[in-house]
């Protein structure tokens, strides 16, 4: 059995998210359907590195599938993009070790969150950034961001998953949370060893409340200590969030 790795970019605006859901259109579903047609199979199981919610975008989602035969990958690459909607693109198709798993072999991920801070929203950014209309103190924002880096129990910043249970291990390491200037606003860059459900959006929501003086910066450590989602702020909207890249140990994407 051979394993193949896809690197995928998509505009999540018109989808219910990555994961297949009943009576809804998902990115995973669209790609699986295209693979079934091209590989002439009734079922192909595509496994993503993690799910993204409705309205969330990706520049570097990773997924894998298994197939019993060798595949002409150049032809498959072109054919997939020919079948898929224009808001989903396959950036690369690669053979990897049969032991590769897009989720469990990942060692870290990078997300970006885009903020639009101008008084008037740029209509061309409305689906790809959060139009934040309160005045903010960027220096406070940067100081608050530092408090999230390192290894923490992120229970207070994680929603329960759809299955009704929180992650078994809420401890994650955030290697960096950088605040960068971006056209019309700011870009928040997150890189960590893994992220809980809605963790990035919940952190952004809390950071923006602190930066706009709605909450005090001293509350952040209290929120961590509470281990209670209700203590953090509301989640930032999905449209500003992008999955940028998933990192693996080896070039072929497989851990030794």
From Swiss-Prot:
For the ligand (substrate), the binding residues are 111
Record carries keyword Isomerase: yes
Q: What is its EC number?
A: 5.4.99.12
What is the reaction catalyzed? uridine(38/39/40) in tRNA = pseudouridine(38/39/40) in tRNA
Is tRNA processing among this UniProt entry's keywords?
Answer: yes
Per the Swiss-Prot or TrEMBL record, the active site comprises 53 (nucleophile)
Q: List keywords of the entry alphabetically.
A: Isomerase, tRNA processing
- A single BP term in Gene Ontology: tRNA pseudouridine synthesis
Q: Which Pfam families match?
A: PseudoU_synth_1 (PF01416)
Mind listing the GO molecular function terms for this protein?
RNA binding; tRNA pseudouridine(38-40) synthase activity
* Subunit architecture: Homodimer.
Task: Name the family the entry cites.
Answer: Belongs to the tRNA pseudouridine synthase TruA family.
Output the PANTHER family linked to this UniProt entry: PSEUDOURIDYLATE SYNTHASE, TRNA PSEUDOURIDINE SYNTHASE-LIKE 1
- This one is known as tRNA pseudouridine synthase A 1
